[in-house]
Amino acid sequence: MNFVVIIPVRFFSTRFPGKALADINGKPMIVRVMENALDSGANKVIIATDSSCIARVIESEQSESEVCLTRSTHQSGTERLAEVAINYKFSDDQIIVHLQGDEPLLSSTMIRQVASILCSMSSTISMATLATPLSSFKEARDDNVVKVVINMNSNALYFSRSMIPWNTGDFVNHLDSKFSKTLLRHIGIYAYRVKFLRRYIAWTKSPLEQIEHLEQLRVLWHGEAIHVSVIDDVFNISVDTPESLSRVNTVFKKNKYATVHN
């Protein structure tokens, strides 16, 4: 299977500036993410950034990854990624995995899995992504945790930072276990083909995308399908705040992931 991983990353994150270079058990976060991508078996790994600081850090690693400096005007990671895919002149059918730079716990297995899912789908599916059952009521109410609702064909109906779906009677203080397969947390990784990216950047930004600050809503707004594969027993923490960074460091210090590259 031929796929390329592109990691769009900027230094001045709105919620947590500088997080890309935040230390995770002795290495910058972006390096941790890059290492997982390199372990996935991707044909190429590219870090797409508008930051010379981030570029220097990646280049100092002397790894097999590449750095592509992009424009600073992009409104989303997908827009930044699309610039790279087009500049590299990848073929229209080339599969691109969008790995977010704040996902240091996303394993190489999951990276390869999302590429494999899209590879097996018909061309009517524009994107593939992953989700896992919500683990707690606290997680469900956390607006840093993105939720997704899917239909009977496992295609996304909607993504939100709010709790969806919501039951005013059953979800007051806990999650009803009978809905465990319906209450899903989105995992921030995508796969798409280059020809889809060309369409994406031509679309206007959708109102839903602007309200939720979720770039994948542009795809649903414009009527295209996102396939969601649900996987169980996924432990993942996105680094959105200093608090979540601390939790990720705790994980690495317990050697759940850190031993891979030491």
Swiss-Prot record:
Name a biological process GO annotation.
Answer: CMP-keto-3-deoxy-D-manno-octulosonic acid biosynthetic process
Q: Which UniProt keywords apply?
A: Cytoplasm, Lipopolysaccharide biosynthesis, Nucleotidyltransferase, Transferase
Under Gene Ontology molecular function, one entry of this record is:
3-deoxy-manno-octulosonate cytidylyltransferase activity
Localisation: Cytoplasm
- What's the domain of life for this entry? Bacteria
Against InterPro entries, the record matches this protein to:
Cytidylyl_trans, KdsB, Nucleotide-diphossugar_trans
CC annotations in GO = cytosol
The record's Gene3D superfamilies line, in alphabetical order, gives: Spore Coat Polysaccharide Biosynthesis Protein SpsA, Chain A
**Pfam families per UniProt:** CTP_transf_3
User: Is Zinc given among the entry's keywords?
Assistant: no
**E.C. number(s) listed in UniProt:** 2.7.7.38
Catalyzed reactions per annotation: 3-deoxy-alpha-D-manno-oct-2-ulosonate + CTP = CMP-3-deoxy-beta-D-manno-octulosonate + diphosphate
Protein's pathway = Nucleotide-sugar biosynthesis; CMP-3-deoxy-D-manno-octulosonate biosynthesis; CMP-3-deoxy-D-manno-octulosonate from 3-deoxy-D-manno-octulosonate and CTP: step 1/1; Bacterial outer membrane biogenesis; lipopolysaccharide biosynthesis
Biological role stated in the UniProt entry: Activates KDO (a required 8-carbon sugar) for incorporation into bacterial lipopolysaccharide in Gram-negative bacteria.
- State the PANTHER family in the record: 3-DEOXY-MANNO-OCTULOSONATE CYTIDYLYLTRANSFERASE, 3-DEOXY-MANNO-OCTULOSONATE CYTIDYLYLTRANSFERASE, MITOCHONDRIAL
What is stated as this protein's family in its record? Belongs to the KdsB family.
Protein's UniProt name:
3-deoxy-manno-octulosonate cytidylyltransferase
Q: Which organism is it from?
A: Blochmanniella pennsylvanica (strain BPEN)
